[in-house]
A protein has these predicted regions:
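Helix-loop junction within the histidine kinase core
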Residues: 74-85
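Short conserved segment of the HATPase_c
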Residues: 31, 173-185
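Short helix-loop "hinge" at the ATP-lid/N-box region of the Bergerat-fold HATPase_c
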Residues: 140-141
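Primarily the dimerization/phosphotransfer
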Residues: 1-40, 61, 199
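Conserved catalytic submotifs in the C-terminal HATPase_c
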Residues: 84-89, 110-120
Length: 242
């Protein structure tokens, strides 16, 4: 059995390295190709030059994101991922996330925040929470062309859980793919740029924080990604503010 496990592990590592090499080559090829065109073609129109430069910049950002994600995976696998816990006012946190992403979401998409009237406090790693939800928001933005994107949270006082969610009216995810999207390097759409690592990393972070991620989606109607996080029952008394 041990030999079989080692063989499976070796196969997974080989597959990971092959995928990683492919994902790194793709933006590098674009950077090198368009850079060579800018150098070799003296009579390119200014508009075309600007397009090439923009493409190079986009692929540089993608490559940097890929490298950061790979480093994050390395920290996860070596057990060196660090967490710093503090008290988080969820209403203030949603406000901050809303302000940041309202600049990034296209104006034709309505960006909505949904929070309870009374602020609710939890003990968590705020940066890691933001990392998870930023991933959800980025994916919603990629796959939503009209309608809305919602960011918010709900409290279930009967189960002592907080549901922090991103909901969209995007293209939706086929049922058979809803588990696969959390696998490394999996992309729902090969024509949409991304590292294919974000949801895999988010899943691990969610588990390290003591929570879990779920997805509900319907083709043509949209998706809802939820981070479900337990809280201590004394939060109702100590951490709620009217």
């Amino acid at each position: 059995m041990r030999a079989k496990d080692l063989a499976i592990e070796a196969e997974l590592k080989q597959s990971f390295l092959a995928n990683m090499s492919h994902e790194i080559r793709t933006p590098l090829n674009a950077i090198v190709g368009f850079s060579n065109l800018l150098v070799s073609e003296d009579d390119l129109p200014d508009e075309e030059k600007a397009d090439f430069i923009n493409t190079i910049n986009t692929n540089c950002e993608l490559l940097l994101k890929l490298i950061n994600d790979i480093l994050e995976l390395s920290r996860i696998e070596s057990g060196n991922m660090t967490f710093s816990y503090s008290t988080c006012n969820l209403n203030n946190w949603v406000d901050s996330m809303y302000m940041t992403h309202s600049l990034l979401i296209p104006k034709e998409i309505e960006f909505i925040k949904e929070v309870p009237d009374a602020a609710f406090f939890i003990n968590t790693d705020v940066n890691r929470l933001s990392q998870i939800m930023t991933n959800f928001l980025n994916n919603a933005t990629k796959f939503t062309k009209s309608g809305y994107i919602k960011l918010g949270y709900e409290i279930d006082f009967s189960t002592y859980e907080v549901s922090i969610y991103v909901e969209d009216t995007g293209k939706g995810i086929p049922k058979e793919e809803q588990r696969m999207i959390f696998e490394r390097f999996y992309k729902q759409d090969e024509f949409v740029q991304g590292t294919g690592l974000g949801l895999s990393i988010s899943m691990v972070i969610a588990e390290k924080l003591g929570g879990k991620i779920s997805v509900a989606s319907e083709i043509g109607k949209g998706s809802r990604f939820t981070f479900l996080l337990p809280y201590h029952n004394e939060s109702e008394e100590v951490f709620s503010a009217g």
